């Protein structure tokens, strides 16, 4: 039988006189007492430093992180400190020496300067005697708490931010997904032409089955990795788990199939990380989740969405308690906060543990001070009974924000046109908020995670009176976007080619098209039908750097959805527009 453990190696130097048992954490030492001679344990081995050969990485930053990651970090870090010690790889010499003592490597963590893997008690004691080994600790494992289903008849109405919008003619036919989107004013933002274009989102879940589903037909997936099995296939097909949960969360944030389901950020780019083995009683192993987050950072993601939330461990492991929800105890919380410091907007489910009058019911890493903890409301705006509550042990308000998580309309993995509204949980509300964040970042890519957090809080339904049931309330994406559009400086030279928006949208018969270029450029804008077939050129001119606009006349066009594609020498951007006569 294998048991899970984590060997931890930090940057602090080790004295020669330190006892090897001093390097073994109390939790691991207790596990040693319950372990047989040949029983393998899953542990982290943490190192004292990263060795001497580190200068090369600071001189050539792209050897450890992508250009996109460096650009994102420039929003929050000084130019001379875009690469940190935590970006440097774990010392390969150290790894090989540990392997020579019998250690079987599972994951590597450059942020925590350690490796996880399997070894016996005696092998671990031998490893602890190495001078450059700092600490050995267990790898924590988590269960997932699923929401208790509620009555679908929802008479509880706390807020309706768009009372007339359900009868409005929108740019797209949202089908049954309109209600969950309308609650957080997503259709109004789509009507402005924003779809999440240019934003990269990392989805971390238990796998993503049936990516051939019709709702993913136009999704741009740029990278995938299975951190459970160590391969790029994130669809399960019976491979250590069931990926139906990931299918649903991915459809909620970025699916697109008119008349059925549209996600907030269907125009974004996605990377998919499988981090959970649902065939296990404790499917979430923290080393997989941390490795996925580091991978996402190195690629250059802007937003992460994950439904991880702790619960009690199986014996002989100890679990976290509500008293550990202080933002500084759980390793996954520490990792999530570090990601935010690197410029990533980290969105996490608050948890499905409901209300307790005596203490919080949060799950790590939602307790992080920089992590956006998302709770759940019903379609009428009332808090879902299963939605976890704060405050954190150190007194901070949690959750941060709310969106619908009760009976959302999602894609399912039974067949390629399968949809369902039977599920509930903060796993559903989390991708709704993450998708809204992507829309806002499309409007202003220079927003830092904390600026984006404050913007969402300040425009939410309880912005002036937050509490530990709803946080700052149900997000109002349109209000957040409008607050940015009213403060845009048209004299600022843009950093990238962007079609900002068309307004009004839908239109009849004319609409204003606005775009921007960073340098003098030859710009062509071409009208296509919804299938991508070219219809006519509507703009072609040499323009100076800055903001430009023109009026598109649709008098000769039929009602429907069209694509506008802007082309320059090296860049192309596309938006959807809707003509309603």
Cite the ranges covered by each PLM segment.
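Subtilisin-like serine protease catalytic core
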Residues: 18, 36-38, 56-57, 135, ...
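N-terminal domain-start motif of subtilase-like serine proteases
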Residues: 20-37, 106-109, 119, 123-124, ...
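Bacterial Sec-dependent N-terminal signal peptides
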Residues: 1-21
